Every structure is written in structure tokens, then in C-alpha cells.
């Protein structure tokens, strides 16, 4: 057995693809409010573009309402402008240093578009997992060719890699199904 091949590293890299997928899906707008919806927004603050999370606190007081508590009173207008200009179709109402954002219902056409986007994200995650699998299998073949591992070890380890791949792709599919159900629920 050699230390050059590490199944834990393969699994970690595959899990990274799932984590990335979950982050991307979190940014997809559904009918419900989610603080992650505003994560990609940057605010022109203090002469630089800063993530919204660095100038305000985002909370979800109700299922269809986001509350953005701006820390600096002078930044309220900049935060409001950034949210309006974000192409998310959101319209904040200002109350002092707090912005309240109602999340409107999604129409059926928009829901279907979001499902398509979710499928693209999931496919990208599957491709990433397959790339990790290919890298692992290539390394195993190289180790076997260099006589660093026996053919029995090669077969056993390749089954481990395939099992990890199958489990990870199954997790991607489950994550996608959950998000799709969330998007399509009215």
C-alpha cells in the first residue's frame, strides 16, 4: 500500500463539489425569503465595492420578508441602491437604518427558468465529481504501472473511488431534487 493515493482526499474533493452546489443553489431565489439571496450583492461603500454582509446584517423575520439592518446610517441609500440594481427584482422599503424587502411570488415561467438553472448547477457539480474520479483513477493506473500497488489493490481502490463517486452524485441528485421541489412549491 502506498501513501501516494489517498481516498480521503478524493472524497474531500468530491464533497467540495457538493458544497459548491449547495452555495450556488442557495443563491437561487425561491418564493421564500433567504438571507443567502442577498449574498452576491456588493455595495459601493467607502470608495470600494464591499459585500453586503460587511455593511449590514441580513435577517429573515418572516417567510416572505428580508430585513437588512445597515450599520452606518450614511450607507442606507447605497445599500438600497445596490439591492434595487441587483437584478433580483427586489424593491426595499426604508425605515430608518432598516430596509425591509418583501419577496414577491414567483410566476410559473420564472419557476421553470430557475429549475433549469438549478439543473445546470447540478450538472456542473456532477462533472466536477467525475473529474475528481478521473484524477483518482489516473493516479491508480499510474501507481499500478509503476508497480507501486498490486493489481488487487488497484481493483479494490478503484471500487472505493467508484463507490465514493456514486455516493456523491447521489447526494448531488438529492440536493437538486430538494431545491427543485422548493422552487416549484407555491
UniProtKB/Swiss-Prot annotation:
SUPFAM superfamilies referenced in this protein's UniProt entry, alphabetically: Ribosome recycling factor, RRF
InterPro entries assigned: Ribosome_recyc_fac, Ribosome_recyc_fac_dom, RRF_sf
CDD domains: RRF (cd00520)
A GO biological-process term: cytoplasmic translational termination
Molecular functions per Gene Ontology: ribosomal large subunit binding
Any single Gene Ontology cellular-component annotation: cytosol
Signal peptide: none
The keyword Zinc is annotated on this UniProt entry: no
Keyword Acetylation on entry: no
Record's keyword terms, sorted: Cytoplasm, Protein biosynthesis
Pfam families: RRF
Compartment annotation: Cytoplasm
Gene3D superfamilies xrefs: 3.30.1360.40, Ribosome-recycling factor (1.10.132.20)
Role, per record: Responsible for the release of ribosomes from messenger RNA at the termination of protein biosynthesis. May increase the efficiency of translation by recycling ribosomes from one round of translation to another.
PANTHER family, sorted: MITOCHONDRIAL RIBOSOME RECYCLING FACTOR PSEUDO 1, RIBOSOME RECYCLING FACTOR
Family note: Belongs to the RRF family.
Official protein name in the record: Ribosome-recycling factor
Organism: Azorhizobium caulinodans (strain ATCC 43989 / DSM 5975 / JCM 20966 / LMG 6465 / NBRC 14845 / NCIMB 13405 / ORS 571)
